[in-house]
Amino acid sequence: FAPETENVDKLLEVCAEHGIIASLGHTEADYDTTLSVIAKAKELGLTVTGTHLFNGMPSIHHRAPGPVAALLTAAKAGDVSVELIADGVHLVDGAVDMAHSHRAFAITDAMAAAGMADGDYELGSLPVTVSGGVARVPSGAIAGGTSTLSQQFASFAARHGLGEAVRFTSTPAADVLGEANLGRIAVGARANLVGLNSHYQPVRVIVDGADISLS
């Protein structure tokens, strides 16, 4: 939701009543408005996230920092978690590295062309053309993601190491969902694991301790 829209207080109350995660995105709210809404959500005990940070938001300006800077500030304080489409298209690596923290996690924002060859696809009712792995609508705007999480893992691991890449692509997202038994290897956690080869391609998938065929 966009913090600057009408009835935002009522929306937060409904989210709190029904246990809905409040995710800020596709917004042009200013810095103070964004932080104010986050504070209200925190008072209500809500889990708050930033929807694909940077995308669908105005860029940071040093005199008008806007929602991106507000969400980064709140993430630093531990009040929100932020999603990053770390595919090198929606966000270049430098932007991902700048925003990376213990409260940031990778998402794909995947559409039908994710992991597929270049060509023509659809996003809802919109025609989409994928060229060079980048999906665009006729206007030229980016139309969802085509990367897989394993591809983002490989890129991130090259800069931050395997351990941090594992955490970035698993644990924080599970924590946002309140799933303490996911996103970690620990006694009592669900045995959901993905095995990758040296090229970071999935070669083995285990769900609840059982091997899943990849053929």
Feature annotation, model-predicted:
Residues F1-S23:
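Active-site gating/metal-coordination segments in enzymes
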Residues L11, C15, H26-T27, T33-E164, ...:
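Active-site-adjacent C-terminal substructures of enzyme catalytic domains
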Residues D118, D175, R184-S215:
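C-terminal cap of metal-dependent C-N hydrolases
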Residues N7, S147, G178, D208-S213:
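Serine/threonine-rich low-complexity intrinsically disordered regions
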Residues I21, S81, V194:
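Residue-level detector of anion-binding/catalytic polar loops
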